Curated annotation (Swiss-Prot):
Family: Belongs to the nucleoside phosphorylase PpnP family.
Function description: Catalyzes the phosphorolysis of diverse nucleosides, yielding D-ribose 1-phosphate and the respective free bases. Can use uridine, adenosine, guanosine, cytidine, thymidine, inosine and xanthosine as substrates. Also catalyzes the reverse reactions.
CDD domains linked to this entry: cupin_PpnP-like (cd20296)
The protein's Enzyme Commission number: 2.4.2.1, 2.4.2.2
Protein name in UniProt: Pyrimidine/purine nucleoside phosphorylase
Organism in which the protein naturally occurs: Klebsiella pneumoniae subsp. pneumoniae (strain ATCC 700721 / MGH 78578)
Amino acid sequence: MLQSNEYFDGKVKSIGFTSSSTGRASVGVMAEGEYTFGTAQPEEMTVVSGALNVLLPGETEWKVYAAGEVFNVPGNSEFHLQVAEPTSYLCRYL
């Protein structure tokens, strides 16, 4: 079953799903802006198109992840994103 989600006044939209190959995941698009997300469990984020400037928990420097690149976020934490252009992503819940 698909589940639609909308965050930050519609600037981030995702569709959640579960599949045998991916497990529980969501795919979505972020408009330009700055966002802070909280995690309940570890997440693996893959940038599909565009780029994300990311500040991960415990880090002091931002890092840019371009299309095809992956980063991991620990559970029970927050991470910060800066988005300069519409960017799509796949988030796997680990």
